[in-house]
């Protein structure tokens, strides 16, 4: 009997097993759309970035003006640039919702998949930070100076490490060149890591909203979830295009319209909105090294979830107190984002410190409450 080409061709077989004949749980909700949306975001970013790189010049005297040239003189350059800048925001919206879904429904119990996901998150954050430096505006330059300077908090090696990263004694041409190099290569590394992420996910199959084994009740990915994903694509692309065409600079920083000047410090140095929560955590610790450790831990703490699970049921759908705690933690992250954009003065400092403690406490207390709830129902 002749097999369809998708089942016999060595290359098509891989794609078929991942996208067409993949058995998927019948009851996965729209919260499971974000994986494919992230794939779409990555493709949009790589394509727009590729065309931007053709016209961009990684030189401190020309970078700002090359971005200006892209927006004014290159055919649809303004569209490429605004799509790329706002595409990054949508990437982070999707990635945070994707992680939040994983925490809520206990998807972190797929340990290798989860750990690779956290590594991808770190890589994407690094990529976005370096991309923000490239236009060489005021906030680009000072953001790069402040964040790279954090490495100087590392005992003994600190200053040597910072100067090695800068390629000199300050953020200069060497820094911009290497940031452009890394910003170009990292998305392809993220793409490779995504393949590994999917490889591990397909070893176990997807989780589902009730957290039970769904092997007895699965349907093929195509056509059911391909069409469901396309609905998600349509909604996201519509919102992205609307933002790009109506208010492309809404999420940017006005300071970045001023060329970088090492002699003038902006009143408020802050990163893009999607890093503000981590920036607020960094500023909440009065000690420099402590702040750096807290900054890294704000993301790295996700890695403890698979190893610190004490509940009988997967996810927190069946734990009412934990649900309240989860949504409180979400509000905490939103408030931290707000605090990150405020000046360093009272009452913002104290609020930031309280929120930081609340953020970290969630990860430590949550499993204990699930255990207590299980014991209560025994």
Curated annotation (Swiss-Prot):
A ubiquinone binds at residue 202. InterPro entries: Cyt_b/b6_C, Cyt_b/b6_C_sf, Cyt_b/b6_N, Cytb/b6-like_sf, Cytochrome_b, Cytochrome_b_C_euk/bac, Cytochrome_b_N_euk/bac, Di-haem_cyt_TM. Keywords: Electron transport, Heme, Iron, Membrane, Metal-binding, Mitochondrion, Mitochondrion inner membrane, Respiratory chain, Transmembrane, Transmembrane helix, Transport, Ubiquinone. PANTHER family: CYTOCHROME B (PTHR19271:SF16). Binds 2 heme b groups non-covalently. Heme b b562 binds at residues 84, 183. Heme 1 (or BL or b562) is low-potential and absorbs at about 562 nm, and heme 2 (or BH or b566) is high-potential and absorbs at about 566 nm. It is a multi-pass membrane protein. The main subunits of complex b-c1 are: cytochrome b, cytochrome c1 and the Rieske protein. Heme b b566 binds at residues 98, 197. The chain crosses the membrane at residues 34-54, 78-99, 114-134, 179-199, 227-247, 289-309, 321-341, 348-368. Gene3D superfamilies: Cytochrome Bc1 Complex, Chain C. One of its GO terms (molecular function) is metal ion binding. GO terms for cellular component: mitochondrial inner membrane; respiratory chain complex III. It holds the Pfam family Cytochrom_B_C. It is found in: Mitochondrion inner membrane. GO terms for biological process: mitochondrial electron transport, ubiquinol to cytochrome c. This is Cytochrome b. Component of the ubiquinol-cytochrome c reductase complex (complex III or cytochrome b-c1 complex) that is part of the mitochondrial respiratory chain. The b-c1 complex mediates electron transfer from ubiquinol to cytochrome c. Contributes to the generation of a proton gradient across the mitochondrial membrane that is then used for ATP synthesis.
